[in-house]
Amino acid sequence: MRDLKTYLSVAPVLSTLWFGALAGLLIEINRFFPDALTLSL
């Protein structure tokens, strides 16, 4: 039970950091390669 409470308190922090880093990475890629995210076939 104690491990579950530790996990529940750590998981939102880790997921917030992970999604923040992922969003920042996508923004930087989109800044340098603005046409990479559009599907131009």
Swiss-Prot record:
Pfam family, one: PSI_PsaJ
Glycosyltransferase as UniProt keyword: no
Ranges that cross the membrane: 7-27
Cellular compartment(s): Plastid, Chloroplast thylakoid membrane
Cellular compartments per GO CC: chloroplast thylakoid membrane; photosystem I
Membrane topology: Single-pass membrane protein
Coiled-coil parts of chain: none
Predominant location category: plastid
Gene Ontology BP term (one): photosynthesis
Top-level taxon of the source organism: Eukaryota
Keywords, ordered alphabetically: Chloroplast, Membrane, Photosynthesis, Photosystem I, Plastid, Thylakoid, Transmembrane, Transmembrane helix
Family statement drawn from the similarity comment of this UniProt entry: Belongs to the PsaJ family.
Function, in words: May help in the organization of the PsaE and PsaF subunits.
Protein name as it appears in the record: Photosystem I reaction center subunit IX
Gene coding for it: psaJ
